[in-house]
Regions:
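Intrinsically disordered, low-complexity regulatory segments
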Residues: 1-146, 154-155, 214, 313, ...
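Basic, low-complexity terminal or inter-domain segments flanking catalytic cores
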Residues: 2-3, 15, 74, 132-133, ...
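Conserved nucleotide-binding/hydrolysis micro-motifs of P-loop NTPases
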Residues: 10-13, 30-36, 88-92, 116-121, ...
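C-terminal or mid-to-C-terminal helical accessory/interaction module adjacent to the motor/catalytic core
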Residues: 118-202, 242-246
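Metal- or metallocofactor-binding catalytic centers and their adjacent structured scaffolds
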Residues: 218-253, 259, 424-430, 437, ...
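Short acidic, hydrophobic short linear motifs in intrinsically disordered regions
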Residues: 237-240, 248-262, 287-291, 443-455, ...
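A conserved hydrophobic secondary-structure block that centers on an alpha-helix together
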Residues: 261, 265-269
């Protein structure tokens, strides 16, 4: 072994070592190896603001073995033979810098190589063209990391102290939550209007075709008058227009467009998309998956062109070079594409293969000819003397589209032809059925993960490496939920003319039904309002985008890191210092819903420690108030007295178990449940108001069975042998010890359990600690 190459991921280490041969040994750092300390031993701040934001780093405890192995190998080959091959983005550059620091490698001379795909030619070429660590990229990554840590470190305690149920606040996540909250309020305020849309089914030469009237009616009366006027009317073709058209393929994928398309076409979340893309990249099947470039290399274009010509013929090939619109994009980088365009199957994993197929087809389509179309519009005049007067003549229009050459649609997209009968101007057509149906304007659509990524990109918030993390974080914190909405049924008026008479009917239509949309929780709305009122810059879209631009300037050596950080931190910290004057009682207003007729006490909807809730009675009254959660789908502003009274009927005695214990149904912090003695059983998606005794007993029995499987043994002093998420273990309530792999947990005696507890170093059992922020906790010490 003469050379050591250090990569980020162990998954790609073997592949790269195979390409480089016996003179190279490839090891992995397994991602980041150091992070900013959470707390220093001497109490000094982890980030010294006064000293140009100097940050103190520490090796992550779980990476100590990795570092030991790397140091041993560095010593074996010599520092001059170490190659840093971490990823080609800013995070990768920062990891390379940290490796230099921890492994005592000279930053000025240590060889740094980058590649956007894991192929033999690319790896070999990278070895021939090494550079050194780019400190501008490192500084940009550090600026982001320091800024995000400062915001979290100083703003989160304010949120804990001032916002009921507040968890934390992030610099980039908070504007994303605000976007979702604003969209939700647009939907809530939306007042729809209805109109009547008229469609007709005509017949010519035994072929039916559909046409739409060129005007809509605001009232049922107007629509009815129009349909009745058709009783003596004739329908004559007055014009036939045919226009050629083309449809061009989209550019190859960037990180953003891949997440959008995978969400739309495959139903993948942003996190799942990036996980599959990471695996495909590590396996050498696609190029680097974090990019905002739509550029393809000349070699990639040539390979795609050759493949298209051989498979489909020269008419299907059109060479294209797409121009990246993003100002921050680096054209030296490439779009996401297959490393071998001829490879159809890249993975045995169905999710990875679906994503690969999407990437491959999009890449091929980008180098294929436009689709050619012929669009036909047939205009049909209404000849009759009873037509109501209107500003423009009432006409029906039938539209058809025929693909005359499929081009790129051969591999990506594809439309069905919309055929029309062969007609000539002056031909008379017969109406088979004419309908005026009530339609309603629609409110703005809730964001999907894909459409939110698109909006963030449009606003300049975040970068390719951060979109998936942003969306995952706001859901993890409980500010946003991905949910389905069943929608509501509504009555729709339908007027129908069958050639003889006009009939009226009412049909049921479901509206507002959605799947997989992002919905802000009440806590999300509260945190967005709080930050908008008191920390405007944190949720301001333009400000957040400008910060991203400044990171780009640091990366391009056009701005000093300390200058940028001071520009953000100084006004931000001033707001933190002023936050002590914020009145917590005015954050998240209370609302009296009504009076409970049984107790004559007020029912109040308000925010509590875990989010919105209902309170029966005053906190300063003689009796302690009762509490209940809000009904599903209700908000503090909208919950009714009837809904609230229903919630206070809980807990409800459903019945008894077979051995005579009461079964109580209720709703708690984590949803609906039943309780038998000290045992709690989730009953999602059952309703505690209506769950039957039979169903409750069934769920209770299943829980008992699961608990029995979990408890392997229990001794009189409280020591237990349990089956856990990560395998069998022993616990005494304060200490957990993993059972050795060669030991059967069922054979462990009390003495053996005590021996393992006393001789094994173990982590204490986790207990939730709620920190209470002091008045000065938000201030920089």
């Amino acid at each position: 072994m003469k050379n050591l190459v250090i990569v980020e991921s162990p998954a790609k280490a073997k592949t790269i070592e195979k390409y480089l041969g016996k003179d190279f040994h490839v090891l992995s750092s397994v991602g980041h190896i150091r992070s900013i300390v959470k707390k220093t031993k001497d109490g000094t701040p982890p980030i010294d603001v006064a000293n140009d934001f100097f940050a103190i780093y520490e090796v992550d405890p779980e990476k100590k073995k990795v570092i030991t192995e790397l140091k041993k190998n560095v010593k074996a080959v010599g520092k001059e033979n170490v190659w840093l091959a971490t990823d080609e983005d800013r995070e990768g550059e920062a990891i390379a810098w940290h490796l230099c620091k921890v492994l005592d490698l000279p930053i000025e001379t240590t060889k740094r190589i980058v590649f956007h795909e894991i192929t033999k030619d690319t790896i070999t070429n990278a070895i021939k063209n090494p550079r050194t660590v780019d400190m501008n990229l490192v500084q940009a990554q550090q600026a982001r990391q320091i800024l995000d840590r400062l915001v979290g470190f100083e703003l989160s305690p304010v949120v804990w102290q001032k916002v009921p149920g507040g968890k934390s606040a992030g610099r980039v996540q908070s504007p994303a939550v605000r976007l979702l909250v604003e969209r939700e309020r647009e939907i809530m305020k939306f007042e729809g209007n209805s109109q009547f849309k008229v469609t007709a089914i005509f017949i010519h030469d035994n072929q039916e075709f559909k046409a739409e009237l060129n005007q809509k009616f605001d009232t049922e009366e107007a629509a009815s008058e129009f349909l009745n006027s058709l009783k003596s009317a004739e329908f004559v073709v007055s014009d036939i227009s045919k226009t050629p058209g083309t449809r061009n393929p989209a550019a190859p994928f960037t990180t953003s467009t891949l997440q959008q398309e995978a969400n739309s076409k495959l139903g993948f979340s942003s996190k799942a998309t990036m996980a599959s893309a990471q695996k495909l990249y590590q396996d050498g099947k696609i190029t680097y998956m974090r990019t905002d470039s739509v550029n393809l290399s000349g070699q990639a274009i040539a390979a795609a062109t050759d493949f298209i010509k051989r498979l489909y013929g020269p008419d299907y090939s059109t060479v294209r070079k797409f121009k990246t619109k993003s100002a921050s994009a680096q054209e030296a980088h490439e779009a996401i594409r297959p490393t071998d365009i001829t490879l159809e199957t890249a993975s045995n994993n169905s999710y990875d293969q679906k994503l690969y197929d999407l990437i491959r087809r999009r890449t091929l389509a980008s180098q294929m000819s436009p689709a050619k179309l012929e669009k036909t519009t047939i205009t049909i005049d209404i000849k009759g003397d009873k037509l109501p007067k209107s500003k423009k003549p009432a006409q029906f229009e039938a539209k058809g589209e025929v693909i005359t050459f499929d081009g790129f649609l051969r591999v990506y997209g594809g439309n069905k032809d919309e055929l029309l009968p062969k007609l000539q101007s002056g031909d008379e057509v017969n109406s088979h059925d004419i309908t005026a149906r009530q339609t309603f304007t629609r409110p703005p659509a809730r964001y999907t993960e894909g459409s939110l990524v698109k909006k963030l990109e449009e606003l300049g918030i975040g970068r390719p490496s951060t979109y998936a993390t942003i969306i995952d974080t706001i859901q993890t914190r409980g500010y946003v939920e991905k949910g389905d909405s069943e929608g509501q049924s509504r009555d729709v008026i339908v007027l129908n003319y069958n050639g003889e008479e006009v009939s009226r009917s009412i049909v049921q239509e479901k509206t507002g039904s959605t799947r997989g949309k992002l919905i802000p929780t009440p806590s999300g709305e509260l945190i967005a309002d709080f930050l908008t009122d008191h920390f405007t810059q944190i949720v301001d879209y333009d400000f957040t985008a400008n910060v991203e631009t400044e990171f780009d300037k640091i990366a391009g050596a056009n701005l000093e890191k300390s200058t940028m950080l001071h520009g953000f931190y100084t006004p931000f910290h001033k707001l933190i210092e002023q936050s002590g004057g914020i009145d917590r009682s005015k954050v998240g207003a209370n609302r009296e819903v009504g009076i409970d007729p049984k107790t004559n006490k007020p029912i109040i909807a308000r925010f509590g420690r875990f989010g919105p809730m209902l309170q029966l009675g005053e906190t300063d009254g003689d009796e302690k108030p009762r509490f209940a959660p809000l009904p599903k789908g209700a908000k503090i502003e909208t919950v009714t007295l009837e809904q609230a009274l229903e919630m206070f009927k809980l807990p409800r005695i459903v019945g008894q178990t077979e051995d005579g214990q009461d079964i109580k149904a209720n709703i708690g912090r984590f949803g609906p449940y039943i309780q038998v003695g000290k045992l709690f059983v989730s009953i999602k998606p059952e309703d505690p108001h209506s769950i039957t005794l039979e169903k409750a007993r069934e769920l209770y029995a299943a829980k008992l069975e699961a608990e029995a499987a979990k408890n392997i043994a229990e001794f009189p002093d409280g020591v237990k042998v349990l089956n856990g998420r990560f395998g069998p273990y022993i616990t005494n309530g304060t200490k957990n010890v993993k059972i050795p792999k060669d030991t059967d947990p069922k054979t462990i005696t009390h003495e053996k359990a005590l021996e393992l507890l006393s001789t094994t170093t173990a982590k204490p059992t986790r207990k939730r600690v709620v920190k209470k922020a002091s008045k000065t906790s938000a201030k920089k010490k």
